[in-house]
């Protein structure tokens, strides 16, 4: 009796572990990288609004110029902002201090509605300080959005 219970337990466990693994799908788009050109953020001295200006170059030879405004108290450190439409693109953003307040950064979400692709360019507070153009330009591989 003890033997048959042990054999049954082993056989039951073996059947569970032999189940096939779920497949995964690579969501990275098989397209050229997108480059954010001449990114610049200017914030008012009272930090009530920050104006972004940048070009989105999807590899077609002509960057699409975008302006994006983040409004409200503490605009430079707003945890969630947007959406804003810029031609075919929808822009949102979020600020994080997960590496400490002195290492804050803003991540943009740039979505192409027609291509159903997204990139997440990120800029540290230090890169954006003084409303200077960020150089070098930064490039990102787009991900495909699920259908």
Locations of regions flagged by a protein language model:
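Acidic, low-complexity intrinsically disordered segments
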Residues: 75-147
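Short amphipathic alpha-helical surface micro-motifs
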Residues: 17-21, 33-37, 47-49, 88-91, ...
């Amino acid at each position: 009796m003890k033997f048959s219970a042990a054999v049954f337990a082993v056989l039951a466990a073996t059947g569970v572990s032999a189940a096939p693994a779920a497949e995964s799908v690579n969501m990275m788009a098989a397209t050229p990288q997108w480059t954010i050109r001449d990114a610049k953020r200017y914030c008012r001295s009272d930090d009530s609004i920050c104006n972004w200006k940048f070009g989105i170059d999807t590899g077609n030879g002509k960057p699409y110029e975008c302006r994006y405004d983040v409004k409200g108290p503490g605009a430079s450190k707003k945890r969630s902002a947007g959406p804003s439409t810029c031609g075919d693109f929808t822009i949102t953003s979020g600020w994080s201090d997960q590496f400490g307040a002195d290492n804050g950064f803003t991540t943009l979400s740039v979505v192409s509605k027609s291509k159903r692709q997204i990139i997440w360019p990120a800029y540290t507070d230090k890169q954006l300080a003084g409303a200077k153009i960020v150089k070098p330009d930064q490039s990102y591989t787009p991900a495909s959005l699920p259908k």
